[in-house]
């Protein structure tokens, strides 16, 4: 995968393959959680059940708020014979789970799959950023206002506040185009967003 391919890719699988061994387990698990939520979006009959519990427990686990045993118990119940513990495989399996709900009408199946792949590829970029241009946070940006703002965005999933974060970062002296553009983008932001994680010191 080249940088240009990364920026334009509409299939998350080669992107995940490129990231393998280059990123954290936490990031991969958060992507898998998004895929699980996409699956539940297509399956409202399961949205209040074990699938939703698995997504919520995984998010708590990656933030140290749930034990491995608690997470593993829910994971095994959900995935049954799917026994891989490697987060990379969970991310790949998540893609297949999200896409499988597109198999509703053979006449439009390929279009539906392509559309869902494009959604997932955009979320890969939101969570992992551009691996060809890593960005470091300047401590000068981490004012009390920005820290409070970004903490609230993460805790509340209040991604509608991202443009406000961009303005605050600019006021603090941030002129990084990648960060500011991402914050102001209308693309979907999710738990694990690379800018939010960067400012919170999460990997």
What are the functions of these language-model segments?
Residues 1-203:
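Structured binding/interaction patches within domain cores
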């Amino acid at each position: 995968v080249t940088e240009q391919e990364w920026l334009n890719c509409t299939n998350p699988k080669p992107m995940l393959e490129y990231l393998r061994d280059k990123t954290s387990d936490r990031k991969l698990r958060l992507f898998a959680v998004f895929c699980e939520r996409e699956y539940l979006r297509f399956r409202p009959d399961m949205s209040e059940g074990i699938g939703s519990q698995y997504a919520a427990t995984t998010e708590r686990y990656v933030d140290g708020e749930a034990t491995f045993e608690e997470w593993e118990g829910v994971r095994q119940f959900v995935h049954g014979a799917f026994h891989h513990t490697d987060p990379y495989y969970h991310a790949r399996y998540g893609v297949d789970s999200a896409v499988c709900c597109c198999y509703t009408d053979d006449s439009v199946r390929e279009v539906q799959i392509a559309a869902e792949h494009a959604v997932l590829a955009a979320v890969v970029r939101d969570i992992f950023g551009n691996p060809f241009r890593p960005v470091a946070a300047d401590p000068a940006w981490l004012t009390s206002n920005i820290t409070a703002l970004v903490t609230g965005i993460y805790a509340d999933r209040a991604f509608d506040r991202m443009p406000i974060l961009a303005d605050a970062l600019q006021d603090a002296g941030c002129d990084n185009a990648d960060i500011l553009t991402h914050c102001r983008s209308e693309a979907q932001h999710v738990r694990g967003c690379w800018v939010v994680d960067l400012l919170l010191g999460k990997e």
